[in-house]
């Protein structure tokens, strides 16, 4: 029996060996094609920390792969999406202006539905083998990615407070309402359509609605009012206790950080669980700043890069996406002194030294991750 098992194992290895060889050959061909290419990477440029990290990525892919990575800072990925749509309408099926795009779920759905994205490539990247498959890396805002996006960071809606000011933070919507009423004018959220402000509203809707399953599907006109009614009632109660009585809102989480630092606010918001640590280390937030979330869970997601179907430098874009998934790049990105963006890799899939380093860099004691509502 043992001899039969050994024979079966050898046969399986022999059958799989050509597949591994072909995959290696295919990737080497992609790297060869990428050599010397210019890759235009459209990415959110609203944080100097992120910009410095991407500048480092540009240096590394130049050094290792002879790729000229040009970062195109955008205020909103929707601007790049409109450009891709305009090129498609003009019949520009090749040689597009965007090779790689940092994209959110709503814009991903828009491009995917219009068949404007390259599909089926992400899980063929060599560094995909390190990805934590327990994270939502195969869907984006409840839309299946189908290999059209490669993950490169994870995020979770997180509150920030100061221990000297708020030793016991609110950890539920009801506690947040009571906290705001107890400290009028010291709580707020970024004005939608700011991503973080919108995420807080989605977080509250998930926690308050009595029809949570409906949020995993596109909104239905017949049920929308009933599904969302608890949120509107809650906001009607919350807004009078907010900063400026809920008649005005900060433009961004960065503005909330500044107001927390000044003592105007007691809470700030971020989508990065390591943000408080990173900003305290840089002196942009007080040293007693800490992160927390709702006990029942907070909204979480993965951020992705995608390749338009009409990209000029497809091979180069794949090589850059693969580098973004490398343990080296992910460890550097997770370092609070660099960016502090949580990794999408599974430490258990890494070699010993990198495994320990990544495990130490991951956020600790996070609340459960709640799936985002459907992108529609």
Residues of each region from the PLM?
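Bacterial N-terminal signal peptides
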Residues: 8-18
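Sec/Tat signal peptide C-region and signal peptidase I cleavage site
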Residues: 19-23
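Short, well-structured alpha-helical segments in soluble
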Residues: 84-93
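Mature extracytoplasmic/periplasmic domains
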Residues: 298-299, 303-372
């Amino acid at each position: 029996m043992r001899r039969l098992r050994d024979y079966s194992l050898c046969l399986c290895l022999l059958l799989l060996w050509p597949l591994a060889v072909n995959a290696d050959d295919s990737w080497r061909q992609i790297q060869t094609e990428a050599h010397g290419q210019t890759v235009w990477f459209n990415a959110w440029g609203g944080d100097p920390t992120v910009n410095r990290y991407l500048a480092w990525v540009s240096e590394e892919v130049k050094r290792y792969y002879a790729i000229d990575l040009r970062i195109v800072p955008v205020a909103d990925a929707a601007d790049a999406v409109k450009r891709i749509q305009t090129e498609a309408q003009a019949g520009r099926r090749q040689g597009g202006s965007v090779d790689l795009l940092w994209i959110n779920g709503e814009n991903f759905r828009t491009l995917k539905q219009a068949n404007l994205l390259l599909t089926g490539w992400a899980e063929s990247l060599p560094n995909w083998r390190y990805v934590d498959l327990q994270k939502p890396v195969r869907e984006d805002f409840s839309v299946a990615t189908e290999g059209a996006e490669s993950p490169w960071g994870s995020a979770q809606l997180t509150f920030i407070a100061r221990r000297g000011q708020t030793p016991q933070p609110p950890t539920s919507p009801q506690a947040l309402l009571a906290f705001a009423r107890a400290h009028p004018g010291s709580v707020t959220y970024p004005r939608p359509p700011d991503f973080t402000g919108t995420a807080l509203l989605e977080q509250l809707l998930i926690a308050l609605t009595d029809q949570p399953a409906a949020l995993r599907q596109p909104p239905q006109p017949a049920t929308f009012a009933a599904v969302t009614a608890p949120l509107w009632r809650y906001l009607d109660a919350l807004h009078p206790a907010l900063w400026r009585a809920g008649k005005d809102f900060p433009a961004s989480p960065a503005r909330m950080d500044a107001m927390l630092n000044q003592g105007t606010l007691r809470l700030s918001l971020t989508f990065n669980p390591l943000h408080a640590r990173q900003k305290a280390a840089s002196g942009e937030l007080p040293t007693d700043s800490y992160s927390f979330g709702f006990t029942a869970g907070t909204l979480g997601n993965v951020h992705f890069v995608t390749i338009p179907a009409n990209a000029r430098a497809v091979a180069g874009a794949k090589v850059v996406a693969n580098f973004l998934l490398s343990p080296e790049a992910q460890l550097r990105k997770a370092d609070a002194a660099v960016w502090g963006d949580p990794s999408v890799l599974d430490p258990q899939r890494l070699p010993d030294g990198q495994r320990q380093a990544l495990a130490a860099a991951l956020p600790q004691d996070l609340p459960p991750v709640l799936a985002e509502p459907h992108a529609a």
